[in-house]
Amino acid sequence: MHIKKGDNVIVISGKDKGKTGVVQSTEPKKDRVVVEGVNIIKKHQKPTQFNPEGGILETEAPIHVSNVQLLDPKTNEPTRVGYKFVDGKKIRIAKKSGEEIKSNN
């Protein structure tokens, strides 16, 4: 998966198109990512011993990785991800600017 935890991404399709956020978690087996402030759902919570009031909680739901695109660290525009070997290590680069992509995690 070309998106990692801590990356800045923009949503390119769906109900939250155009929103940007930081990737909070990834689910590689399902090809899904959870982005901060994107795809907010309301979850109805029954009262429990720990939360006696229950109620409606708002939380982020995972979205498919094909619906998000990485933001170029140099130009802050959507870009594709490329890979390059430097000193025997594989690093991610932004296709638009050639800048190295570093995660914020």
UniProtKB/Swiss-Prot annotation:
Q: One Pfam family name from the record?
A: ribosomal_L24
Q: Which UniProt keywords apply?
A: Ribonucleoprotein, Ribosomal protein, RNA-binding, rRNA-binding
The UniProt entry's GO CC annotations, sorted and at most eight, read: ribonucleoprotein complex; ribosome
Q: Name one GO biological process term.
A: translation
Q: Does the keyword Ribonucleoprotein apply?
A: yes
Q: Name the SUPFAM superfamilies for this protein.
A: Translation proteins SH3-like domain
> Which regions form coiled coils?
none
Domain of life according to the entry: Bacteria
Q: What does this protein do?
A: One of two assembly initiator proteins, it binds directly to the 5'-end of the 23S rRNA, where it nucleates assembly of the 50S subunit. One of the proteins that surrounds the polypeptide exit tunnel on the outside of the subunit.
Indicate the family of this protein.
Belongs to the universal ribosomal protein uL24 family.
* Subunit and interaction comment: Part of the 50S ribosomal subunit.
Name under which the protein is recorded: Large ribosomal subunit protein uL24
Species name? Staphylococcus carnosus (strain TM300)
- Read off the lineage from the record: Bacteria, Bacillati, Bacillota, Bacilli, Bacillales
